[in-house]
Amino acid sequence: MSSRARLSRVSIAALLVSVAFSGFARAEMAISANDGKVKLVDGVVQVQKDGKDTVSFIDLDANPPKVVAEIEAPTSVVGPPMSVAVGPKEDFAIVTGAMKVSPADPTKQIPDNKVTVIDLATEGAGIVGTLKKATGIGTPAAPRTPKILATLEAGAGAAGVSINKTGTLALVANRNEGTVSVFTIAGKTLTAAGKVDLGNKDAGPSHVVFTPDGKSALVSRDADHKISVLSIDGAKVEYTKRDMNAGLRPYGLDISGKGDVAVVANIGIGQGDNDTVSVIDMAATPSRVVSTVTVGQTPEGIKMSPDGKFVAVAVMNGSNKPAASPFYKANGLLQVYSRTGTQLAKFAEVPVGKWCQGIAWTSNSRKLAVQCMVDEQVQVFNWNASKLTTAGTVKTTGGPAGIRTAEK
């Protein structure tokens, strides 16, 4: 080999290392939990006897976006669409399953408590594999299909799940027993570390999210209309007895990357009224609800952009109702609100599919993915900080019911 060729290969390797550590060598994945047990037929949920739940791994960097792998794992559309959490290193994910088909009556569902841990490691798609392929030094390993590492138990109706920024603790909201399950994390191994009792077995804890410093968390309680504050010290998690009130049935919940504000989607009672999104001032002592905006019928999904400038909301808009209902609309809505301090203002809106669920942003705040249950697809949009444009549509096996990207 000539010295020029060797130099060229070294230069390529150096360039790839530079690109890799700039965050561009690895595809950005959204993980979608898909409920195959139920379908919505003219506004009525019907249980599917032989339906299979799946988890899809979606490459959002591809043009158009595409599913690169799919495995079976228990999940559920019941509960907020935050039934997925991704480790900060993107090496593992957690998926919860709030409901299962009743063994006694296959036309009905009963609460489940499943927590599935999934290995996401793929050397062939990462920095090492990229360098090997480009430089010819060694043989790159083939990308591995994500695999289930463990299936654990939380509480009845295991729904919203989050992982702290250091990847050492996970919390799961248990809708059917009024508790939050605590799991410690070592590498990719989860260990049950007890439960937090919220003082009301019928509270309906829906989602739980950490503050960026990991010292506290918020829990939405849609059955008794509260948002509770938890304190965290290592693996010790306690209910502080501090509750906030935002609106009817607080459900989806998110906290900004800086931890200065939180947003909560109040889904209401589903009777055709316009529902709301509230902003919580996390910098105040104590934290408190400070503003609310009207968004439309049933804001199921909510997610702040990683740069903290925008809030995306998936509004059902009556698309989940019978066609004969006076509140029925043929499509849902994806809305984007700009944020100034603790105030939100509608900035953009596009129609999406029916009975839409979760939302995920890419880490650069330039793409949005929204799940639509009836259509069994994830719609992906480009976002240039002023306008939403279609980037592509991804089909899933089963109705997409929960979605997340890594939150670093």
Which sequence ranges carry the predicted segments?
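Hydrophobic helical h-region of N-terminal Sec-dependent signal peptides
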Residues: S11-F21
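Predominantly soluble domains enriched in secretory-pathway, periplasmic, or organellar proteins
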Residues: R4-R6, V19, G23-K408
